[in-house]
Amino acid sequence: MRGGAAPISLLGHDRPESVVAFRNGEPVTAAHFLADVAALAERLPRRGHVVNGCIDRYRFAVGLAAALTREQVSLLLPSDAPGLMEQIAEQYPDLYYLTDGTAMPGGAIDAVAYPEALPVTLAAAAVPAFAAEQRAALVFTSGSTGRPMPNLKSWGAMAASARAAGARLGVAALSGAALLGTVPQQHMYGLESTVLLALQQGLALCAGRPFYPADVCAALEALPRPRILVTTPIHLRALLADGGRVPVVDAVLCATAPLAPALARDAEARFGAPLHEIYGCSEAGQVAVRRPVETEIWRCLDGFRLRQDGEGTWVTGAGAGEVLLQDVIELIDDERFRLQGRTADLVNIAGKRTSLAHLNHHLTAIAGVADGVFVAPEEAGGDVTRLAAFVVAPGLDAAAILGALRQRIDAAFLPRPLYFVTALPRNATGKLSREALRRLAAEFAAR
């Protein structure tokens, strides 16, 4: 391990018998987890970079820790497209792919299978600790040129962020809580809120990632309390859509897209727990938290600060340097702000200005609309003279939706045309990529 002051422990669990995870309905202790980490670390190839493709969240956590033990950097990619993986491999020729399933990277990238059974020796083992400056992860964003852009995360920055989030969310009062996530751990929000938060705060991550509402409810019911649900607005909306009973939880965390206040209120009432929304980005990680039923104002995690200049809003904190945020922010002070929307989402039509996020909020707030999104068509000269929208609204027609929108937004921003779809092409975190929307628009334009 590299030198440096005060190495940072992998785990926040204080006893070998503390529960680190739940897998296949059974608790996994810290001692067992550390034995798995040591056993896997011995089997990893001598490489510098790894894409951890493990679907099982427990195995992913073991793989992450084993890579840290071997001083290997874990790469988090914006998608699992084979072409992207090959492009990344050109930049990192010592890359390999760790998998626990049938998914393979393709091309010339070496794949390493997570063993079905690791030899476990439950002897007392010291908890690994790593230098704060150790390179832990490279988180890739799509990049303005279409070429993935890496953002380096040190172990110190990742651990500090998880501890700051835990302090703001009050997880100390939920000692040993089980974390169930509907989001993949290969993306920043999932990594921070379902893996690192558990490891650093002495919580228990859940190996599975249920998708369908009935499966999510069953998985929650199977967990002991306290229990925390980590999800997204689109998953939350699906969970609450049928109006049926959902299990009581002790906290709900939500991120990746704007959360409608009405949905937040419904979630708190149905789950019987506070819902906290997390704001962040791949470049900076998690930055701020708010409880939407109480306030629209975001408050930065301890150690994070904001400033503004002619370029926009900058954030510093958690040892990650200074990052320019890609959002329109109304700064109250260096710790508190209101979020106005994405910089790239701003539209100006007939001298009137708004954001696509604002319009999406009003669209999805219409009774009977299950999902929806506004898009700004690419027009000659770069000017936007009209907007389009895609909507999932069985039981409604265009007249009903446009009539409801007229009561909520300026007529200049009404969608022309309005397309009805059975589902929007959201990814595993509930996001809609620009490319996915472009393909959807092209499909309808060709009809």
Question: Model-predicted segments: where are they?
Answer:
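Conserved C-terminal "lid"/linker of ANL adenylate-forming enzymes
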Residues: 347, 388-390, 404-447
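Conserved AMP-binding A3 loop
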Residues: 27-29, 128, 136-163
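Conserved pre-ATP/AMP-binding loop-to-beta segment of ANL
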Residues: 2-16, 117-140, 172-179
